[in-house]
Swiss-Prot record:
Designated name of the protein: FACT complex subunit SSRP1-B
Domain of life assignment: Eukaryota
Cellular component, GO annotation: FACT complex
Basic and acidic residues bias: start-end ranges: 513-524, 536-546
Biased composition (Acidic residues): 476-487
Length: 640
C-alpha cells in the first residue's frame, strides 16, 4: 500500500490483552495484522462511521467505529503521527477524526452513552472507560436502582493477563434524566432494557444446538459440544472449555484419505489454555458417513432479524456438514475446504511425519496444514522457501521410496515433513510450483543429474544421496581411513555423534578443515590388497566383507588439530539448541553445517585463526611424540 501509512508495534485493545501487530492505513480503508501471524482485521472505508483520537498513558489511541456496531481500538501511536494521519484521512478518505479526552480525575459518577455495541462511562465531556456489550454474558437488576453486568469468562481472552473483568455495577437514581422512568418503570430498568437489546445475554442458559460424545483429538478427549449464541462450550469428564466466537479465526473441513473420518478444525486467536499448554487449533474428528438431524432452539424472530440467510430452523445431513454450517452461521467464521491438490490415490493429503508424530499433510490453496498432532498451519505468505530432500532424520540415508519436504519460514523457523512416499513427489512438486513458492533446489527437483527426481526415480535403494554427500563434503573428515572404514562398515551405527561424544569422534563426523590427501592415498593403496571375499558357504552373506580389527590407539599420542568448523560448532551449538529445543542432536549438526557453508570468508576468519593455532600446537606435539617414540625404539634392545 504505497499510497498510505504503515506502522509496526501497534496494539489492538480488548479483553484478550494487548496484541501488537502491523497497522496499515490507505485510501480504501485500514488493516491490522497480529505480529507473528493470526488475527487479521480489515475495515473498508465505506464501513467506517467515525474515527476518534485519544491521548492515553505513554501513547495515543485510534478508535474506529463501523456500520455493524463494532468498535476497534488501536494504540501505540506517537504524538507526531496524529497530524499526518488526520490529514491523510481528511484528504483521501473524506473522514474527519474527532478528538476525545480521557478522564483521569478518578470520579465514579457521570453519564452512560451507548453507541453501537460500546458502552462508555463519561465524566463531564471526558471518557472514563468503555466496555464492549458483546462481552456481556448476563445483565440483571438489583433492587430498583442498580444494574449489574456480568462478563464472559472464557478460556481464550485474557490468557496472558493476571486479572480479568468479571462484573460491573451501575447505580441509577430514580431522578436520572438521561434514562427517564416512572413509578412502574424506574430509570435503572430503562438502562437495563437498553443494554439487554445490545448484548447477547441469556444465551448461557440454553444451547442453540448440542452434539454429544464428539471425539476431539486436540485437546484430547470426548466432549459434549454446545453451540450458544455468542460462544461454544466443550464439556468433558475432566475439562470444560468456553470459547467466544470472536476468538474463532477460521474453520477447516478436511476429509481423511481412504478413511471413514473427517477432520473439522477450529482455529483460534487467542488460543485456549490447559495448564501451561496452549491450543490454537481444536481438532475434531467426525465419522464421515454419520447422519444427524438437529433443530435449533431459536425463535423465528431471532432467525429473521439476526441470522437471516445464515441459519435455518433445522438441519439434516452428514454430521460434520451440519456442525460446520451451524457454527459458521453463529460465529460468522469462514470455512476452508480441500484444494485442487490430489494425491496419487486421489486423496486430499499425503502421509508424512512431523517431529515424532505421523499424520497427514494437506496442501491447501493458501497454505499447508499438518494433522492431527501437532496441528500445524503454515500460510504460503509466511514461507521463505521449500526444499525437497531425500534423506532421513539427521541425514541418514534411507530407501529412495521416500523423500522429505523442508519448509523454511520468513522468521527462520523450519518444518521438516519426513517420509513422504516417492509416488507423491510429482503431484506435490507440481502443486508447489503452481503456487509460485520458491523451491531452493529447483534444478535438482526438476531432474538434473544427481538431483532429487533422478534419485527418486531410481529403484536402487543404495543409490547415492546427494544431500548426504553434500553434508559430508561440507563437514570434511580429519580422522584416519582406518577408523572411517570401521565406522561405515557398522551398518547399525548410522547416526551422528551426540553432544557427549569425545572431541576426536566429533572431528570425524563434523570437521570442516582441510583433508590430509597424501596420507589418505597412501593408506588407501596399502589397504587395497587386504580386502578379501568371504568364501561361499560362510556365515555371512555372499559378497560381504570381513571386518578388519581396529588398530589400537596410543593414549600418549597428541590430539589432532581441530578444524575451523569445529570451533564454529562449539561456539554456536548452545545458542542453536536454546533457540530450537525441539531439534535432535543430528538435526543440530546438519543446521550447523548449513550455516557454515553460507558464511563468508571474513565471518569464518576467527575460527580459521583458532584452527591454525591448534595445528601449530599439533605439529609441535607430533614432533616431540615422534622423537620420544624413536628414543623408545633405540632403547628397546638394551632393555631386553
Amino acid at each position: 500500500m504505497t499510497d498510505g501509512h504503515h506502522f509496526n508495534n501497534i496494539s489492538l485493545g480488548g479483553r484478550g490483552g494487548n496484541n501488537p501487530g502491523q497497522f496499515k492505513l490507505y485510501s480504501g480503508g485500514l488493516a491490522w495484522k497480529r505480529q507473528g501471524g493470526g488475527k487479521t482485521i480489515e475495515v473498508e472505508k465505506s464501513d467506517i462511521t467515525s474515527v476518534t483520537w485519544m491521548a492515553i498513558p505513554r501513547s495515543y489511541q485510534l478508535g474506529v467505529s463501523t456500520k455493524e456496531g463494532l468498535f476497534y481500538r488501536f494504540f501505540g501511536f506517537r504524538e507526531q503521527d496524529i497530524s499526518s494521519l488526520t490529514n491523510f484521512m481528511e484528504k483521501n478518505m473524506r473522514i474527519t477524526p474527532e478528538e476525545k479526552q480521557l478522564s483521569v480525575g478518578g470520579h465514579n459518577w457521570g453519564g452512560i452513552e451507548i453507541n453501537g455495541n460500546m458502552l462508555s462511562f463519561n465524566v463531564g465531556s471526558k471518557e472514563a472507560f468503555e466496555v464492549s456489550l458483546a462481552d456481556v454474558a448476563q445483565t440483571q437488576m438489583q433492587g430498583k436502582t442498580d444494574v449489574v453486568l456480568e462478563f464472559h469468562v472464557d478460556d481464550t481472552t485474557g490468557g496472558n493477563e493476571k486479572d480479568s473483568l468479571m462484573d460491573l455495577s451501575f447505580h441509577v437514581p430514580t431522578s436520572n434524566t438521561q434514562f427517564p422512568g416512572d413509578e412502574n418503570r424506574p430509570s435503572a430498568q430503562v438502562l437495563w432494557q437498553a443494554i439487554l437489546n445490545k448484548a447477547d445475554v441469556g444465551s448461557s442458559e440454553e444451547a442453540v444446538v448440542t452434539f454429544d460424545g464428539i471425539a476431539i483429538l486436540t485437546p484430547r478427549g470426548r466432549y459434549s459440544v454446545e453451540l450458544h449464541l455468542s460462544f461454544l462450550r466443550l464439556q468433558g469428564q475432566a475439562n470444560d472449555f468456553k470459547i467466544q466466537y470472536s476468538s474463532i479465526l477460521r474453520l477447516f473441513v478436511l476429509p481423511k484419505s481412504n478413511n471413514p473420518h473427517t477432520f473439522v478444525v477450529i482455529t483460534l486467536d487467542p488460543p485456549i489454555r490447559k495448564g501451561q499448554t496452549l491450543y490454537p487449533h481444536i481438532v475434531i474428528q467426525f465419522e464421515t458417513e454419520a447422519v444427524v438431524q438437529r433443530d435449533l432452539t431459536l425463535s423465528d424472530e431471532v432467525l429473521a432479524e439476526k441470522y437471516k440467510d445464515r441459519l435455518e430452523n433445522s438441519y439434516q445431513g452428514l454430521i460434520h456438514e451440519v456442525f460446520s454450517k451451524v457454527l459458521r452461521g453463529l460465529s460468522g467464521a469462514k470455512v476452508t475446504r480441500p484444494s485442487t491438490f490430489r494425491s496419487c490415490q486421489d486423496g486430499y493429503a499425503v502421509k508424512s511425519s512431523l517431529k515424532a508424530e505421523d499424520g497427514l499433510l494437506y496442501p491447501l490453496e493458501k497454505g499447508f496444514f499438518f494433522l492431527p498432532k501437532p496441528p500445524t498451519l503454515i500460510l504460503h505468505e509466511e514461507i521463505e522457501y521449500v526444499e525437497f530432500e531425500r534423506h532421513g532424520a539427521g541425514g541418514a540415508s534411507i530407501s529412495s521410496h521416500y523423500f522429505d519436504l523442508l519448509v523454511k519460514l520468513k522468521n527462520d523457523q523450519e518444518h521438516l515433513f519426513r517420509n513422504i512416499q516417492r509416488n507423491e513427489y510429482h503431484n506435490l512438486f507440481n502443486f508447489i510450483s503452481g503456487k509460485h513458492l520458491k523451491i531452493l533446489n529447483l534444478g535438482e527437483a526438476q531432474g538434473r543429474a544427481g538431483g532429487v527426481t533422478a534419485v527418486l526415480q531410481s529403484t536402487d535403494d543404495d543409490a547415492v544421496d546427494p544431500h548426504l554427500e553434500r553434508i559430508r563434503n561440507q563437514t570434511g573428515d580429519d580422522e584416519s581411513d582406518e577408523e572411517d572404514e570401521d565406522f561405515v562398515a557398522d551398518k547399525d551405527d548410522s547416526g551422528s555423534p551426540t553432544d557427549d561424544s569425545g572431541e576426536e569422534g566429533s572431528d570425524a563426523s563434523l570437521s570442516g578443515g582441510e583433508k590430509e590427501k597424501s596420507s589418505k592415498k597412501e593408506a588407501s593403496s596399502s589397504k587395497a590388497p587386504l580386502k578379501k571375499r568371504k568364501p561361499k558357504g560362510g556365515d555371512a552373506a555372499e559378497g560381504s566383507e570381513k571386518r578388519k580389527p581396529k588398530k589400537k590407539k596410543d593414549p600418549n599420542a597428541p590430539k589432532r588439530a581441530i578444524a575451523p568448523f569445529m570451533y564454529f560448532s562449539k561456539a554456536e551449538r548452545a545458542n542453536l539448541k536454546n533457540s530450537n529445543p525441539e531439534l535432535a542432536t543430528t538435526e543440530i549438526a546438519k543446521k550447523l553445517g548449513e550455516r557454515w557453508q553460507k558464511m563468508t570468508a571474513e565471518e569464518k576468519q576467527p575460527y580459521v585463526e583458532q584452527s591454525q593455532v591448534d595445528k601449530k600446537r599439533y605439529a609441535e606435539e607430533s614432533a616431540a611424540y615422534r622423537g620420544a617414540a624413536a628414543m623408545d625404539v633405540d632403547s628397546g634392545p638394551a632393555s631386553d
